[in-house]
Structures are given as structure tokens and as C-alpha cells.
Curated annotation (Swiss-Prot):
Official protein name in the record: Aspartate--tRNA(Asp/Asn) ligase
Binding sites annotated in the UniProt record for L-aspartate: 173, 219, 450, 491
Family matches, as SUPFAM superfamilies: Class II aaRS and biotin synthetases, GAD domain-like, Nucleic acid-binding proteins
Organism: Coxiella burnetii (strain Dugway 5J108-111)
Family: Belongs to the class-II aminoacyl-tRNA synthetase family. Type 1 subfamily.
Keywords: Aminoacyl-tRNA synthetase, ATP-binding, Cytoplasm, Ligase, Nucleotide-binding, Protein biosynthesis
Site (Important for tRNA non-discrimination) location in chain: 30, 81
Biological process according to GO: aspartyl-tRNA aminoacylation
Enzyme Commission number, as recorded: 6.1.1.23
Signal peptide per UniProt: none
Function in brief: Aspartyl-tRNA synthetase with relaxed tRNA specificity since it is able to aspartylate not only its cognate tRNA(Asp) but also tRNA(Asn). Reaction proceeds in two steps: L-aspartate is first activated by ATP to form Asp-AMP and then transferred to the acceptor end of tRNA(Asp/Asn).
């Protein structure tokens, strides 16, 4: 029906007759002429309807916003002073010789141009209207282009795109599984995959030494901000590799994507920091390196002070005291400090002690703080030295269990940087390496920090069992501007080590055989050295397009309560469907 998209209409087509199809974005009457902004997937074109073309003009008079039309006409240069430099077609317009009304539209539930005034739930309910916004359409197009380029990049390097099952077996991977009842096997269930982890390892055992997949994953977890129950991963695995092989390949790919789509050069190589460095310096294993603020540890200075708020965590093996220096922060008001105190409380902090450095040359006389009277002068002097405090700074203190201090001061670091716009540079990628293999809350059960198939830097299974807290993994995460966009590891390919890891996690051989015996069996038939990585594609596209949420780069996202306003899913089903599956709905137990 059409000859061109809007973005292809420019001065090279002057005096040519073309046909466009799309929606009436806006209709305007001006001095006897009717102007129509026609919108399609690629942009806008101005159409001019002259009363001398009586049939065309009559149709144009009847048009309303979002009517679907086909326009045929000749491309003309716009009159002087009417050029629109903001769109590709801005130098020209179409003099309509024919307009066909293809379909009408009901009055809109909201004006597409005024989406800011509409709740997200309403926009998602009428998502087909929300998707007509040019900026939303552009993000989805960018997503398509990025995926296409990723496929090309990997195809050229010998990777095979291999699909893995969507209906699989429930395994303990951290979050809850979405379960699918089997009609043909009453009382038994499939699970939707949280990741293709086990299948891609089995593919390596089978000899497919370079695999990738753009794959949907499903996790029935309590939704935090900007999470989705179903999401898309770039998943890949390689055989006969070490960490550096995977990291170098992925760096090359990310640099290529940023250069191709954003014209942004990223560093070569990406910097690397250890997990321990990240936690101690930034309070998180996902540091935003654009943020110049850092945490300074002062736990050792507080072991002998009389101030219990500091002394107790300093002498607790699981405690920590750290300081966050904010340059020129002494001018913060009492209200601002109270707001930040309330903010860190979200992360479990019981308060937010501070020292304002009003004049560094006057010793303690140049300081202002309610806690000064509790600290010896030599301790205060050392704090100022370690933090490199200057006149006009403020020092914020965190004192509690290390986890609370890290999370609260890490979040405060991000908040201060955002509030005061302290960012240095636009793009700061970093590899985080040397993660602990296991983690636990004080004296709780050990859990795998990544997953139980991650290879360890320790090669002796007995040492792993004896001292699990000392063992580092061969895992690596790639973080960009404070967001983890990818994570992976070298995998265990030795059955003895795999059983040792499972034992630390409290999983017996019998339980392991029942849950993922298919992988354990495969490891015994010549498993090569292997490793891989998975990228959160939604997150990567959101970052590259400047979207504020991953929901903005997903065509039909769920809400934060895991619901779809468009389809009203999830929903009840007919009793007969449940009976066919041998299911009965009981009262929900939280």
C-alpha cells in the first residue's frame, strides 16, 4: 500500500509522487489549508491539503487524531521559514492528491503527547496507544537493532544459536519457579526456566563448544524496583576457555555495541576490581565508578573508644565502621541531614552520625558534631587524615553489622551523587572478580553467592568442605554505571568438586541426583573446561537508550506487582480446566 516510510521522505524525492500509510498525529486548519502530521513507525511527515482538491479536502476535514489513513501526493519543498530541523522530513511536505480513510479511532483514553499526566497502569492497559509514542517506538527499534548486531557479532565468531527447553524440571536456583502442571502426567509439573544454565553446560559436554541464545527466563520472585517476572538474556557458553577468554570477548562486544549505536568509545581493557575491594570502597559489588565518593574503613580506630555506638560494632567480628566523605558538604542543612538519616534507615541503619569540617586548620575546634565529645582527639585526627578531609567537608559514619553499613552507606553514596550531580564521565564499565564462593548470614546455612555450578579457585574438595568461608570462586560480573549488566563464571567440570560444593550447601548426593542428576551424569562423560556469561538484555538496552526503567524497553511489560493490565493476567481459569489437570485451588497461604 505504501511506497515509503516517513524517515525516507526528504529533499531527494522532490517532485516525485509517493504513498504513505499511518496515523493522524495532529491535524491543523490554517488559512484555508489543512495540515496533517502523518505518523508511522519511522517518524512524521507533514501533509498539505488544498481546497482546490475538493475530494481530498473533504476527507481531511473529517479526520481526527489517530485515524488511520493512506496518503498519495507529490513531494514539495517547504516554504521558507517553515522548515522543521528536528525531523528527517522537515525540509519537505506532501501535497495530497488522494487520501483514503482506512479506519477510524474512538476518542482516546489519554492524549498520547501528554503521557506524563497518565498513570503507568493506564498506559500499560492501553499499551498499544503508549507504544505509538515516538520515543517508545525508538527504544523498541533500538532493541531490535542491538539484538541483530549481537547475533551478527557472535555468528561471525563461530557461535551457534541453539534453543533450549522452555518446559523443564524445577531445580533450586534461588528464586521460586513458575510451575506448569502436566495433564498427561497427573500430579507432576514442569517448570519454566530461570536460566538455561544446566542445558548449556550439557551442550558443552556434547561438543558444541560455542553456544549462544537470546532467551526468555522466568523467576517467581518478590519484585523489587525495576524487575520483571519474565525477562530476556543473552546467554552464552564456551569450552576450553579461562576467565580472560570470555572477558576479552565480551569487552569487545560491548565496546562494539557502544561504538556502533552511541558513537561512544569505552576503555580497552575494562578495569577490574575484586569483590572485597568493591564492598570495602563502595559498599556494593555493583559500583558506579562515575561517582567519586568512597567509603573509608575506621573500624580499627574504634575498638578502644568509650562511645558504645562505635565500640560495640568495632569489636564484633561481623561489624564495621566506615566513613563517607562528602566534599563541600558542611553546608548541608539540618533538614537535609535528617532526610539522609531517614534514608539510610531503609537499609537497617539506626542513625547517621556526622562531623562537619568547618576549618581543618583549627583542629577539633574547627569541627562541628554531636559525637565529638565521645571521641579522643588522636582518633579524630586519624579519621581526618584517612579520609583526606578538607575545610567545608562533611563526614558521614556507618556503624553496625558490616552488611548494614555497606548497604546503607553504599546507598547514601549513590543518593548523594545523584542529588548533587557529582558524576565524573558518562560511561564507566568495570569487571568485579574474586567473589566468595559461599555466603551466609552470621551463623546461618551456607549459600552459593552465584550458583552451585560455579568453579572455585581452590582445587582440593576437602579444603572446600573444611573452610567454605575462605574459598573464592571463578565468577565475574560486568557492571556499567552501577548496574550489573552481565554475570558469569568458569564452571565446575569435575564430579568430585561438584559433590563437595553441594555438600557445603547441605544438598545430599541423593537430593542432588533427584534435582539435577542429568547434569551430574553428564559431567562423568568427558566434560571439557567450560565457562560462560549471561547479559540482562533488557537492562543493557535500557542503559543504552537512556530509559528510566526496563519496562520502557519491553513491548508488553508486567507491573511491579507482576500483573499485565492489558490482558488482566494472571486470571482465574474455568473449573473444568483445573479438574482436567487434577488441580484444586485452596486458600492462599503467604
Amino acid at each position: 500500500m505504501r511506497t515509503h516510510y516517513a524517515d525516507k521522505v526528504d529533499s531527494s524525492l522532490i517532485d516525485q509522487t509517493i504513498t504513505l500509510c499511518g496515523w493522524v498525529h495532529r491535524r491543523r486548519d490554517h488559512g484555508g489549508l489543512i495540515f496533517i502530521d502523518l505518523r508511522d513507525r519511522e517518524g512524521l511527515v507533514q501533509v498539505v491539503c488544498n481546497p482546490t482538491e475538493s475530494t481530498v479536502f473533504k476527507v481531511a476535514e473529517s479526520l481526527r487524531n489517530e485515524y488511520v489513513i493512506k496518503v498519495t501526493g507529490k513531494v514539495h519543498k517547504r516554504p521558507e521559514g517553515t522548515v522543521n530541523p528536528h525531523i528527517p522530513s522537515g525540509e519537505v511536505e506532501i501535497a495530497a492528491s488522494d487520501i483514503t480513510l482506512l479506519n477510524k479511532s474512538k476518542p482516546l483514553p489519554f492524549n498520547i503527547d501528554e503521557y506524563q499526566e497518565v498513570s503507568e497502569e493506564v498506559r500499560l492497559k492501553f499499551r498499544y496507544l503508549d507504544l505509538r509514542r515516538p520515543e517508545v517506538a525508538q527504544r523498541l527499534k533500538m532493541r531490535s537493532y542491538i539484538i541483530r548486531e549481537i547475533r551478527r557479532f557472535l555468528d561471525e565468531r563461530g557461535f551457534l544459536d541453539i534453543e533450549t527447553p522452555m518446559l523443564t524440571k524445577s531445580t533450586p536456583e534461588g528464586a521460586r519457579d513458575y510451575l506448569v502442571p502436566s495433564r498427561t502426567h497427573p500430579g507432576q509439573f514442569f517448570a519454566l526456566p530461570q536460566s538455561p544454565q544446566i542445558f548449556k553446560e550439557i551442550l558443552m559436554v556434547a561438543g558444541f563448544d560455542r553456544y549462544y541464545q537470546i532467551v526468555r527466563c522466568f523467576r517467581d520472585e518478590d519484585l523489587r524496583a525495576d524487575r520483571q517476572p519474565e525477562f530476556t538474556q543473552l546467554d552464552l557458553e564456551m569450552s576450553f576457555v579461562e576467565e580472560k577468554d570470555i572477558q576479552q570477548l565480551m569487552e569487545t562486544m560491548i565496546r562494539h555495541l557502544f561504538s556502533t549505536f552511541l558513537n561512544v568509545p569505552l576503555p580497552d581493557p575494562f578495569p577490574r576490581i575484586t569483590y572485597d575491594e568493591a564492598i570495602k570502597t563502595y559498599g556494593t559489588d555493583r559500583p558506579d565508578l562515575r561517582n567519586p565518593l568512597t567509603l573509608v574503613d575506621v573500624t580499627d580506630l574504634m575498638k578502644s573508644v568509650e562511645f558504645k555506638v562505635f565500640k560495640e560494632p568495632a569489636n564484633n567480628p561481623h561489624g564495621r565502621i566506615a566513613v563517607l566523605r562528602l566534599p563541600k558538604g558542611a553546608e548541608l542543612s539540618r533538614k537535609a541531614i535528617d532526610d539522609y538519616t531517614q534514608f539510610v534507615g531503609i537499609y537497617g541503619a539506626k542513625g547517621l552520625a556526622y562531623i562537619k569540617v568547618e576549618n581543618i586548620d583549627n583542629g577539633t575546634g574547627g569541627l562541628h558534631s554531636p559525637i565529638l565529645k565521645f571521641l579522643p582527639e588522636n582518633v579524630i585526627a586519624e579519621i581526618l587524615k584517612r579520609t583526606q578531609a578538607q575545610s567545608g567537608d562533611i563526614l558521614f559514619f556507618g556503624a553496625d553489622k558490616a552488611k548494614i553499613v555497606n548497604e546503607s552507606l553504599g546507598a547514601l553514596r549513590d543518593r548523594l551523587c545523584a542529588d548533587l550531580n557529582l558524576y565524573e564521565g558518562q560511561w564507566k564499565p568495570v569487571w568485579v572478580v574474586d567473589f566468595p564462593m559461599f555466603d551466609r548470614e552470621d551463623v546461618g546455612d551456607w549459600q552459593a553467592l552465584h550458583h552451585p555450578f560455579t568453579a572455585l579457585q581452590e582445587t582440593d574438595p576437602e579444603k572446600v568442605i573444611a573452610n567454605p568461608g575462605d574459598v573464592l570462586s571463578r565468577a565475574y560480573d560486568i557492571v556499567l554505571n552501577g548496574s550489573e549488566i552481565g554475570g558469569g563464571s568458569i564452571r565446575i567440570n569435575d564430579i568430585g568438586m561438584q559433590y563437595a560444593v553441594l555438600k557445603v550447601l547441605g544438598i545430599s548426593k541423593e537430593m542432588a541426583e533427584a534435582q539435577f542428576g542429568h547434569l551430574l551424569m553428564a559431567l562423568q562423560f568427558g566434560s571439557p573446561p567450560l565457562g560462560g556469561i549471561a547479559f540482562g538484555l533488557d537492562r543493557l538496552v535500557a542503559i543504552m537508550t537512556g530509559a528510566s526503567s526496563i519496562r520502557d524497553v519491553i513491548a508488553f511489560p508486567k507491573t511491579q506487582t507482576a500483573q499485565c493490565p492489558l490482558t488482566n493476567a494472571p486470571a482465574q481459569v474455568e473449573t473444568l480446566q483445573l479438574e482436567t489437570l487434577g488441580l484444586k485451588v485452596s486458600k492462599h497461604r503467604k
